[in-house]
């Protein structure tokens, strides 16, 4: 069994969805988390989770989208979580690569998402791109001010220092198809060293199809490719990857039963 801890199922057409879910189940992917990126999209996330028993959801505003509308308040974010199949908050974080919103706006949004996690106890799904120092600083500041909160560094491709900082505070790291890319030697070295009980896998589909399928549309079934590379770098078999990452997923997302 595998879990795709981060995908965007609402990006598929209605005609594609049944087939995408079906192929995931055939590949042994028995849980999928479809991710929130805008406030107005939360209803669609919840509808997908209601429709498919294998699908759960998160709610939040992606850092690339925070300049499109006023940042939701902490109270508004908490209200969005009030659904039995919402198991996390995000994805939120900082994206200084695209810089589609002012950095101070991204930072304020990130802080509000963290505070919503502190209020609800739900895990934070973190997006980090070219912003490692500010991500680590904000996480530490908010933890000191408001207390601990569970967190997942999604689609990890950042520095060893950021991964270790997240793990040191009890967080988790999710590996995507980037792990399979030929040039990802450093990422594979980090993945080999991270604590076993902090690892998850994901697709971030429909983006980031794994090697040798780069350039094609990604989907949850293909998380098996990432799992296979993780097995190789850890010296495990694929069954152990499934056992470890599924156990870690359920420990983090404890509302997913």
Model-inferred region functions:
Residues 1-257:
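Mid-domain alpha/beta scaffold segments of enzyme catalytic cores
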């Amino acid at each position: 069994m595998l879990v795709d801890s981060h995908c965007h199922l609402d990006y598929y057409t209605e005609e594609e969805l049944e087939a995408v879910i079906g192929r995931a189940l055939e590949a042994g992917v028995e849980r999928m988390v479809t991710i929130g990126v805008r406030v107005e999209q939360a209803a669609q996330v919840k509808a997908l989770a209601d429709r498919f028993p294998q699908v759960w959801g998160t709610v939040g505003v992606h850092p690339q989208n925070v300049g499109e509308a006023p940042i939701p308040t902490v109270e508004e974010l908490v209200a969005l979580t009030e659904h039995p199949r919402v198991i996390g908050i995000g994805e939120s974080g900082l994206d200084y690569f695209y810089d589609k919103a002012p950095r101070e706006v991204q930072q304020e949004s990130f802080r509000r998402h963290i505070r919503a996690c502190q209020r609800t106890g739900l895990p934070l799904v973190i997006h980090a791109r070219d912003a490692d120092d500010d991500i680590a600083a904000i996480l530490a500041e908010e933890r000191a001010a408001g207390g601990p909160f569970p967190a997942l560094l999604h689609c990890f491709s950042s520095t060893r220092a950021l991964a270790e900082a997240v793990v040191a505070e009890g967080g988790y790291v999710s590996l995507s198809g980037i792990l399979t890319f030929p040039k990802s030697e450093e990422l594979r070295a980090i993945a080999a060293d991270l604590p076993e009980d902090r690892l998850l896998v994901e697709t971030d589909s429909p983006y980031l199809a794994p090697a040798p399928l780069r350039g094609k549309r990604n989907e949850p079934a293909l998380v098996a490719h990432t799992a296979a590379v993780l097995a190789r770098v850890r010296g495990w078999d694929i069954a152990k990857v499934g056992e470890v990452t599924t156990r870690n997923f359920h420990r983090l997302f404890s509302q997913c039963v």
